[in-house]
Amino acid sequence: MKILFVTKQDYHGVPNGGSAGSKRNFQLLSELADVDLYHIKTRKNLFAYLSLIFMYFPGITLQHIQEINQKCKDEKYSAIFLDASLFGGIAKYIKRKFNCKVVVFFHNCESDYFKMLSKKNIIKSLYYLYALFSERQCTKYADIIITLNRRDQKRIAEEYLRKSEYLIPVTFEDKFIKQKMNRQKQLCNEPVILFVGSFFLPNYEGVKWFIENALPLISAKLQIVGKGFEKVKYELEALNDKLEVIGTVQSIEPYYTDAACVVMPIFEGSGMKVKMAEALMYGKTVFGTKEAFEGYEIDCQKAGGLCNTGEEFVTAMNQFLKNPVYYNSYNRQIFMEKYSNSNVKTIFEEILREVST
């Protein structure tokens, strides 16, 4: 079976949450079928502006449509896997012109995300309308829709009157080697709390809230690691002298290894938080909000703690830091049982069987 996989993610750049989920999809499909990758690169030219007239989401152009059209003519794909719900225009074009199945993966409910942004940036209101239109097209023309969790499944059904056929949660390729844990460094240094996430609004607002409302009363240093956070390094570090902003890194592993625990003060969003699965993979204790744990089948107290206020973060984390355990065997077990790539491979196999009929 031959499949065309369409994505906006660059798998060769600095990894982030979005690219990790997309790369997982591509890798597992490639193990099961003959998959061609089509990378939608953002272009600023006449095609980009003309595409807005046709209600393609910004960044998707008529030129992209033409290139996908040519690939479909040449290769005669059995299915097109659209790795974002913002590809509604592509879904519509494919279904009207070619006799092949269309699968759409909703990494979250994008219209909800842009609606949230539009409250703080009027220009994002336009993006919200394009996202709404694109997701409506996806739900109309896709043969199969995949969501991360039941919350997104329910939200999409409410908004577009279409329920997703499959649930595939966030998972990771297991890269953890327990022997690499630097126990000597952990015993000698002041405990480090780790926040991991790329620089976008919910992450920025969440970690800034934590710095202002919890960190002053917690007996540890905070490190912030994630693509783009170096942009606000001096702004954030000025808020507390127990804070170090690292920003973009090529490898996240050393930071997880040396951290006593992970904090996830996320209050807005949809989908599942990719960095939660990553923290579980490394066997790290996690203190997070309800939003951070959303979609994960886990005992929050065994994982670390469910904290939604500054006081809850301070109490739970200071108690943990009295005798920090750098390796949480429960979290590691949950990862192996539910959030390792091998646990969802059978679902992709089932999807491929369905699109081949």
Named regions from a protein language model:
Residues 1-43, 75, 213:
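N-terminal subdomain of nucleotide-sugar transferases
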Residues 3, 96-116:
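Active-site proximal beta-strand in glycosyltransferases
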Residues 21, 171-235, 245, 249-250, ...:
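Conserved catalytic-core segment of nucleotide-activated headgroup transferases in glycan assembly
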Residues 136, 140-179:
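Donor nucleotide-sugar binding/catalytic pocket of nucleotide-sugar-dependent glycosyltransferases
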Residues 275-281, 285-289:
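Short hydrophobic beta-strand element within catalytic cores of glycosyltransferases
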Residues 324-354:
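A charged, aromatic-enriched C-terminal amphipathic alpha-helix characteristic of glycosyltransferases
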